[in-house]
Swiss-Prot record:
Keyword vocabulary terms for this entry: Coiled coil
Protein name stated in the entry: Uncharacterized protein YrhO
Gene: yrhO
Gene3D superfamilies (alphabetical): Endonuclease Chain A (3.30.870.10), Winged helix-like DNA-binding domain superfamily/Winged helix DNA-binding domain (1.10.10.10)
Pfam families reported in the protein's UniProt record: Regulator_TrmB, TrmB
Coiled coil: 75-157
PANTHER family from the UniProt entry: HTH-TYPE TRANSCRIPTIONAL REGULATOR TRMBL2
Length: 275
């Protein structure tokens, strides 16, 4: 138990000697420096240096008399003080590193992401940084894993629009159900995800290969613009189909199958990106 407490105090930036002295005072106080050394096992040659460090840091109080006596800050107060100090440090770091944000958001690079979980984690981070609009193409199987972040963004006033492959229901997003979800899944033999945030960054890739899934994240305008516009073009098409499906299917077949086949390069009319 004592060893565990020593480790905990070390995690709170106590040295080993400081930890032993503080624990000794928690068990019994007030004590003289000599008594603290005897009770804690800290060498007498080091004890006053250790106690002075604790006093300066505010973890121990000292009464200045003929024989100084030491008492510890109560454990609850110590934890509260450490938590407040840590929050101050985080606030300072956040303000300091803000000026490097633009450098970190390098608009010239394209970054590869490997693994389905890693791809979805990046998408979550992008979602939470969006300020105005999110455009997303996603399968039902993957939607649930980022739904909480999407809802949080929507509650912050971000407009969320989803092209859904599969039956996705949402009370916070504009959802366009793709009528050909099953056909497309079979045709491609896989699932992709395309995210665009604020017309300034995109994540796009295949998410159906588990650890072998691949995606790219970028703020490069040469990719952000066309990928975002492809999503918007799909939305245009879905709005047109909603109003003129009968007319269009009369010309191009059910679910526009003739168009899909017209622009296929394979005799089986399937996609072979994953081969």
């Amino acid at each position: 138990m004592k060893e565990n407490m020593l480790d905990i105090l070390k995690n709170l930036n106590f040295t080993e000697y400081e930890s032993k002295a503080y624990l000794a005072l928690l068990q019994e106080s007030p004590l003289t420096g000599y008594a603290v050394a005897k009770k804690s096992g800290v060498p007498r040659s080091k004890i006053y240096e250790v106690l002075e460090s604790l006093v300066i840091r505010g973890d121990v109080f000292v009464s200045h008399g003929n024989t100084p006596q030491y008492v510890p800050v109560p454990a609850k107060e110590l934890i509260k003080n450490r938590r407040l100090k840590a929050e101050e440090h985080f606030d300072q770091a956040e303000k300091y590193f803000e000026k490097f944000e633009q450098t970190a958001n390098d608009r010239e690079n394209i970054w590869n992401i490997t693994g389905r979980s890693e791809i979805l984690e990046k998408v979550k981070a992008c979602i939470l940084s969006a300020k105005k609009r999110i455009l997303l193409e996603i399968w039902k199987e993957d939607f649930k894993e980022i739904e909480a972040e999407l809802k949080q963004a929507a509650e912050q006033g971000v407009i969320v629009t989803i092209i859904a492959y599969g039956d996705i229901v949402s009370d916070f997003a504009n959802v366009y159900l793709h009528d050909m979800s099953s056909e497309i899944t079979e045709e491609y033999d896989g699932r992709w995800l395309v995210y665009s945030g604020d017309d300034s960054e995109v994540v796009a890739g295949i998410v159906s290969l588990g650890n072998d899934s691949r995606a790219a994240w970028t703020m490069h305008v040469g990719l952000v613009m066309p990928i975002t516009e492809v999503i918007i073009h799909d939305l245009y098409l879905m709005e047109i189909l909603k109003k003129h499906r009968e007319l269009l299917e009369e010309s191009f077949g059910k679910n526009l199958i003739q168009l899909r086949r017209k622009f296929s390069i394979h005799s089986d009319f399937k996609k072979h990106y994953l081969e």
